[in-house]
Amino acid sequence: MKWSVRGACAALSSCLLLACALSAAAVGLKCFSLGSELRGEPFRLGAAAGAFYSGLLLAAGLSLLGAALLCCGPRDAPLAGSEPGPGLGVPAAPAGAPEATPGESGAAAGAPGPVSSQNLLLLGVLVFMLGVLSAFAGAVIDGDTVSLVERKYSHYCLPPRAPGSSPGSAPGSTPGSAPGSAPGSAPGSAPGAPRARSTLDSATSAKCRQLKDYQRGLVLSTVFNSLECLLGLLSLLLVKNYKSSQARRGRRGRRRGGRALARPRGGSGLRAQPPASRARRGRRGRRGRRLQQRPSEASILSPEESDLAAPGDCAGFAAHHAVSYINVGVLHALDEAGAEVRCGGHPSVELPGYAPSDPDLNASYPYCCRPPCETPRPWETHRAC
């Protein structure tokens, strides 16, 4: 079996993570048993088993991921030039083809293999992520429990100091002794501290040893949980990279196999172009010619629309040039019956200082120029439209 660089890195990180998960599960089980023994008086501690659950979840997730990648992976990507196997790439039978024989139907029945592989891969990723999250939570909880156990140990297991004792005092004298005290009184008070220590050790020695072991186990559990978080995320990235590279190799192999099948066996080496591709290319050419730029119907610069609005046709000009002209006045004109009508322009009253017939305003206000439909004909000076 040939391993790539990505596959080797993913396998190495997965093996390290599996060893770390199993070690964390063992340490978590030991911490759970010690915490259950220390639950009563005088410590009143709880059993922290975060490493145990995270180790089990990570081991189960790695097993599912390995089964999905190793056992079901080679069926998804057939080799280039080989016959299509019972997976992806099985061509559909044409319309006029005869029915398949029982042997061929048995070969085609292996199509649900990739589906089950994908389901197994998704299940493995889900369990794996649950293990990583539980490892993160276990690292936080175990770190807090370590500080709590340290306080419990210093309170219950360490012997109490004498009220007047200090670390810098002389071994033959006590700081609280009077200046005139006898020198023989100091040796008589010294054996009192060993008697108190021996009395404390005989009462709680077993519990204190268990508490110290529990603290060491919690420290190891915190370290293993942190390693599980880091190695878990690294392994997930490496497995994802390996899976994507494997899918790319499979697609490249199927593409080379398709080119090899499309090339004629005894020809000159040129690829035979199927009629479907020629028809598709012809449709692309026609679509490109059809999508050439056409002049817009609302374009003012279109040369074909110069004769759309004849002189006097205000309705036709307004239909094609709705926004090309702004008339700031009202043009009054007479129709054939002699009635006064409004032909185009703004429906407000005539603005002060504006005369539609004043040619000097056309240069200053080009938007006030009359459209061609409102320009009177030379022989019809009495009509505005």
Curated annotation (Swiss-Prot):
Keywords, A to Z, come to: Membrane, Transmembrane, Transmembrane helix
Regions that span the bilayer = 9-29, 50-70, 121-141, 219-239
Ranges of Basic residues compositional bias?
246-258, 278-292
- GO cellular component annotations of the record: membrane
Secretion signal, residue range per the UniProt entry: none
Record localization: Membrane
Q: How does it sit in the membrane?
A: Multi-pass membrane protein
> Where does the record place the region Disordered?
83-111, 160-203, 245-305
- Composition-biased stretches, type Low complexity, lie in 163-197, 259-277
Its predominant location is membrane
List the protein's name.
Transmembrane protein 271
